[in-house]
Amino acid sequence: MAELRDFKNRFLQLMARELPGATTVRVTLHRWRGVKIGSGVFIGYDTIMETAHPELITIKDGATVGIRCTILAHFWDFHKPVVIEEDAFVGPGAIILPGVVVGRGAVIAAGSTVTNSVPPSILVQGNPAKPIARVGKPPKDGTRFQDFVASLRPIMKKKRERGPSEQMVGSS
């Protein structure tokens, strides 16, 4: 019986990766696999979602998962759910690892690897993904790119104290 379930998941995953219909066909196929998906969700072409345990993934209303993203919820015997909250945006080619919660209105930049949860309305980027800005307007239907960019507020890094060996010679 487990082999039949695995075959079904792999077959539906393959179909969802290749067929058109980012808000219709792909969403329906992933739901059939067991992924919990809200309304108004966009799933980009060639996206891979946890093959062995799709039931560990939740994508809430209005979220966007860009093309060629990978969402994993387990490694061997390590199983942790992944949740993508309302209006979150996962950029193309991003990788989300087990146990991550992407907060409401959060944005993951293209190509980022997310190893820790992302707070609501925060933009992260890099490998591993780090917070770089606060998001005023998440990039969803009806939001112009210019308005999204204008809404970003950089997160300033805390300045660290200079140690004695780093102070300039001759300064007082």
Where do the model's predicted regions map?
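Extended, small-residue-rich solenoid/repeat segments and analogous flexible loops
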Residues: A2-M49
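C-terminal segments of enzyme domains that contribute to small-molecule binding surfaces
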Residues: L14, V82-V90, I95-I96, N127-S172
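Structural signal for interior beta-strand "rungs" in well-ordered beta-sheet cores
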Residues: H30-R31, V35-I37, V41-Q125, A129-P131
